[in-house]
């Protein structure tokens, strides 16, 4: 029997600006941030199973194969909401580092929602998929859409803006994991530097690359740097090597640099390879997903 298969890409995201406005009554934090997709992606193969079960496969030992996996949760949500009696095997080929502040797990969940919508002929719109994504995790709605957007609420309210000018994004991740809950737990909003998110929207919409580089900011940086000084050292090293702008993504520990010129990108990339285990040079993507 030929089983239906589908391949789906799950691109990573970076935060060009991330601010936390306060704690909500539901326990989440109110955020205002700008996210954009980059050309670093996991690849998922979705294969229909005759048996009514969800199977997660991956060669990466850090990828859970049970309900802790957000792709599993996405498949389970669709099965329960729409009474799907088929099963699915989800093979995740990881390229995005795990627990890195790049929304790898959220993007896998979003890719699963988009892919199963097609595989199971559910006929949902991308807005409906994004709404379902919000039930799984705060970044999943954005990852369903991709592109470049302002995210508010707990991160699930999405407003699209223009794509920033094309450039290189150099990523460096130290060999540590950072607990997002711990970072938010240690955040003191009156003791941190708040970025100007509105100004970032203006310079992105104006296509002002220098303005973007001058305006990047992440309110969580100081907290993560205090907990993990090696993250601050990577940022300092990337600045020293000459990146146009350097920032930690999400709650860390990945640090990214924006670089316009190819020759400088190669120099920074090679310099960081001797300093940090996981280094990537990719393009800023910023393209929105479509449902084929």
UniProtKB/Swiss-Prot annotation:
One GO term (biological process): isopentenyl diphosphate biosynthetic process, methylerythritol 4-phosphate pathway
Highest taxon in the source lineage: Bacteria
Enzyme Commission number, as recorded: 2.7.1.148
Keywords of the record: ATP-binding, Isoprene biosynthesis, Kinase, Nucleotide-binding, Transferase
Residues the entry annotates as binding ATP: 97-107
GO molecular function: 4-(cytidine 5'-diphospho)-2-C-methyl-D-erythritol kinase activity; ATP binding
Catalytic reactions of this protein: 4-CDP-2-C-methyl-D-erythritol + ATP = 4-CDP-2-C-methyl-D-erythritol 2-phosphate + ADP + H(+)
Pfam family name, one: GHMP_kinases_C
InterPro entries: GHMP_kinase_C_dom, GHMP_kinase_C_sf, GHMP_kinase_N_dom, IspE, Ribosomal_Su5_D2-typ_SF, Ribsml_uS5_D2-typ_fold_subgr
Pathway: Isoprenoid biosynthesis; isopentenyl diphosphate biosynthesis via DXP pathway; isopentenyl diphosphate from 1-deoxy-D-xylulose 5-phosphate: step 3/6
Active site: 13, 139
Family matches, as SUPFAM superfamilies: GHMP Kinase, C-terminal domain, Ribosomal protein S5 domain 2-like
Function summary: Catalyzes the phosphorylation of the position 2 hydroxy group of 4-diphosphocytidyl-2C-methyl-D-erythritol.
Family of this protein: Belongs to the GHMP kinase family. IspE subfamily.
The name this protein goes by in its record: 4-diphosphocytidyl-2-C-methyl-D-erythritol kinase
Lineage per the UniProt record: Bacteria, Bacillati, Bacillota, Bacilli, Bacillales
């Amino acid at each position: 029997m030929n089983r239906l298969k589908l391949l789906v890409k799950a691109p990573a995201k970076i935060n060009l600006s991330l601010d936390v406005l306060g704690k909500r009554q539901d326990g989440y934090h109110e955020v205002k941030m700008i996210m954009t997709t980059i050309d670093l992606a996991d690849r998922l193969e979705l294969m229909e199973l005759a048996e009514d079960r969800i199977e997660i496969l991956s060669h990466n030992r850090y990828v859970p194969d049970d309900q802790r996996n957000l792709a599993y949760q996405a498949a389970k949500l669709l099965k329960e909401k729409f009474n799907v009696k088929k099963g699915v095997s989800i093979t995740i080929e990881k390229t995005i580092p795990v627990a890195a502040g790049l929304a790898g797990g959220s993007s896998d969940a979003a890719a699963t929602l988009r892919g199963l919508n097609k595989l199971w002929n559910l006929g949902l719109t991308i807005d409906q998929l994004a709404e379902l994504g919000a039930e799984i995790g705060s970044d999943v709605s954005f990852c369903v859409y991709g592109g470049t957007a302002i995210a508010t609420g707990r991160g699930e309210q999405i407003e699209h803006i223009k794509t920033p000018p094309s450039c290189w994004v150099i990523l460096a991740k130290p060999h540590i994991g950072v607990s997002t809950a711990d970072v938010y737990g240690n955040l003191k909003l009156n003791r941190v530097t708040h970025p100007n998110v509105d100004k970032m929207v203006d310079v992105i919409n104006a296509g002002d690359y220098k303005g973007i580089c001058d305006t990047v900011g992440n309110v969580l940086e100081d907290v993560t740097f205090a907990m993990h000084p090696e993250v601050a050292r990577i940022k300092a090293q990337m600045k020293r090597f000459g990146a146009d702008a350097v920032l930690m993504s999400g709650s860390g520990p990945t640090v990214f640099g924006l670089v316009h010129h190819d020759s400088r990108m190669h120099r920074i990339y090679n310099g960081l390879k001797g300093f940090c285990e996981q280094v990537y040079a990719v393009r800023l993507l910023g393209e929105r997903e479509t449902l084929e």
